[in-house]
Amino acid sequence: MRIFLDTANIEEIKKGLKLGVVSGVTTNPTLVAKEGISDYKSVVQQICALLPEGDVSAEITAEDPAEMLKQAREIAKWAPNVVVKIPATAEGLEIISKLSKEGVRFNMTLCFSVNQALLGALAGAAFVSPFVGRLDDAGHDGMMLINDIVSIYKEYGFETQVIAASIRHPLHCTQAAQTGAGIATVPYKVLMQMMQHPLTDSGIARFMADWKSVQK
């Protein structure tokens, strides 16, 4: 399993990379706006430079099909390791099918059903991103969707990789790994929480107290 960071914050990415466990980044218009960034291309290229061997997803912002196609072509030129994020819509599928044949890699995002994931794989998407947290918020079982997609992809030999997205807490990461998702994209806060455990903290405190007691 691989871990991606779901952020457009350069400092968070640098900190995450120092841990040696992050191999990709996903961004979207909301994350970029959160950072007050107006030059999307520049920040994506910065991120791509930080992870020359990693996958960096950058999302289109257009809704008109012709403009979506234009943006997808443009984003694909930003860096060798950029992946174009495109919504799971009929228009998105058409663009994935067309440009994947030209070597453009796509991350089909906002996936909320097995059928969407199936069609994305058939169209040639390199990645598909089921949104676990948002499904949970709506009263559905987000992890069951991940499990079903992984099972179907395995059954039919699809090479499309599953990115468990909309991760809200460390348990989501555990569950994603258990279901066989190849990737989980997580906020920096969740990444750090994954390494935390109260027994680790208390164990360190006990060891240090014992060591100091024999140094007197």
Curated annotation (Swiss-Prot):
Transaldolase is important for the balance of metabolites in the pentose-phosphate pathway. Keywords: Cytoplasm, Pentose shunt, Schiff base, Transferase. One of its GO terms (cellular component) is cytoplasm. It is found in: Cytoplasm. The gene is tal. This is Probable transaldolase. GO terms for molecular function: aldehyde-lyase activity; transaldolase activity. HAMAP family: Transaldolase_3b (MF_00494). PANTHER family: FRUCTOSE-6-PHOSPHATE ALDOLASE 1-RELATED, TRANSALDOLASE. It catalyses: D-sedoheptulose 7-phosphate + D-glyceraldehyde 3-phosphate = D-erythrose 4-phosphate + beta-D-fructose 6-phosphate. One of its GO terms (biological process) is carbohydrate metabolic process. It is an enzyme of class 2 (transferase). The keyword Membrane does not apply. Pathway: Carbohydrate degradation; pentose phosphate pathway; D-glyceraldehyde 3-phosphate and beta-D-fructose 6-phosphate from D-ribose 5-phosphate and D-xylulose 5-phosphate (non-oxidative stage): step 2/3.
